[in-house]
Amino acid sequence: MPQKDPCQKQACEIQKCLQANNYLESKCQAVIQELRKCCARYPKGRSLVCSGFEKEEEEKLAMKSGSK
């Protein structure tokens, strides 16, 4: 049986917040930050819902190293 995603609860909270606020991310920064904190607690690849943040971080690092 697959393991439950450790950050699934936070991801669901983001969806609820976005739906309640007409998908305005600016209204949901607190819950987005909670998901980021959750993702930071687990090794890369452990949480499927964190994969978007992981990709975002990789892109930021690639841009930084390319601008030197």
UniProtKB/Swiss-Prot annotation:
Pfam families, sorted: CMC4 (PF08991)
Disulfide bridge positions per record: C7-C38, C17-C28, C39-C50
Superkingdom assignment: Eukaryota
UniProt motif (Cx9C motif 2) ranges: 28-38
Entry keyword Disulfide bond: yes
SUPFAM superfamilies reported for this sequence: Cysteine alpha-hairpin motif
Record's subcellular location: Mitochondrion
Domain notes: The twin Cx9C motifs are involved in the recognition by the mitochondrial disulfide relay system.
Family membership: Belongs to the CMC4 family.
Protein's UniProt name: Cx9C motif-containing protein 4
Gene that encodes it: Cmc4
